[in-house]
Amino acid sequence: MEPLRLLILLFVTELSGAHNTTVFQGVAGQSLQVSCPYDSMKHWGRRKAWCRQLGEKGPCQRVVSTHNLWLLSFLRRWNGSTAITDDTLGGTLTITLRNLQPHDAGLYQCQSLHGSEADTLRKVLVEVLADPLDHRDAGDLWFPGESESFEDAHVEHSISRSLLEGEIPFPPTSILLLLACIFLIKILAASALWAAAWHGQKPGTHPPSELDCGHDPGYQLQTLPGLRDT
């Protein structure tokens, strides 16, 4: 079992060094947030996904993806203990791994989907630490092993933390924009209804006076000629 594990560790180490891989370190039992920045204009209208790399040339098995409707990408979607949310205006894809476990360690990808193809936004190597106070000791790393092997990898400041139950993150830019659009639409609709009601009134028309007694002003009383001579 140990030789097999050593081979896996060496494989992941070489793979992470060959690519521009970012290392995210998390503590077992806590939550880890992974951020993947991207060009919001280039990837406008595209769904995003989080997948796990299977082998050097194997496929990247999808773990979770954003909402099928791109406009709702800001909504958090869960698959087991993994969540994904996309700030399409800010250009940041955020993945949350809740209750981090040793088997969660490994190589992942943030992807931008277009049709049947996918562009890699960032390669991520997740490390699971046994003790946050002793994370520099290689013996406390479940995966992938010694830190000296990641000379070419960029270590992100992403030590995991416990999420409080009452903690509510600030809404992303997409939510604020959606609320602003809804508010603007309501204002425009109210203005249109008010304008239609104002134009519907006919200026200069007055209700009939009580002195008319119901007679048509076009008819007048005339004296008969025979009655005038008598």
Swiss-Prot record:
It comes from the Eukaryota. The chain crosses the membrane at residues 175-195. GO terms for molecular function: amyloid-beta binding; apolipoprotein A-I binding; apolipoprotein binding; beta-catenin binding; high-density lipoprotein particle binding; kinase activator activity; lipid binding; lipopolysaccharide binding. The record marks H157, S158 as: Cleavage of ectodomain. Changing T223I: Affects protein maturation. Changing N68K: No effect on cell membrane localization. A 1,2-diacyl-sn-glycero-3-phospho-L-serine binds at H67, N68, R77, T88. Changing R77D: Decreases binding to THP-1 cells. One of its GO terms (cellular component) is extracellular region. Glycans are attached at N20, N79. Disulfide bonds join C36-C110, C51-C60. Residues 196-230 are cytoplasmic. Changing V27M: No effect on cell membrane localization. Monomer. After ectodomain shedding, the extracellular domain oligomerizes, which is enhanced and stabilized by binding of phosphatidylserine. Interacts with TYROBP/DAP12. Interaction with TYROBP is required for stabilization of the TREM2 C-terminal fragment (TREM2-CTF) which is produced by proteolytic processing. Interacts with PLXNA1 (via TIG domains); the interaction mediates SEMA6D binding and signaling through TYROBP. It is linked to Polycystic lipomembranous osteodysplasia with sclerosing leukoencephalopathy 2: An autosomal recessive disease characterized by presenile frontal dementia with leukoencephalopathy and basal ganglia calcification. In most cases the disorder first manifests in early adulthood as pain and swelling in ankles and feet, followed by bone fractures. Neurologic symptoms manifest in the fourth decade of life as a frontal lobe syndrome with loss of judgment, euphoria, and disinhibition. Progressive decline in other cognitive domains begins to develop at about the same time. Alzheimer disease 17: A late-onset form of Alzheimer disease. Alzheimer disease is a neurodegenerative disorder characterized by progressive dementia, loss of cognitive abilities, and deposition of fibrillar amyloid proteins as intraneuronal neurofibrillary tangles, extracellular amyloid plaques and vascular amyloid deposits. The major constituents of these plaques are neurotoxic amyloid-beta protein 40 and amyloid-beta protein 42, that are produced by the proteolysis of the transmembrane APP protein. This is Triggering receptor expressed on myeloid cells 2. The lineage of its organism: Eukaryota, Metazoa, Chordata, Craniata, Vertebrata. The gene is TREM2.
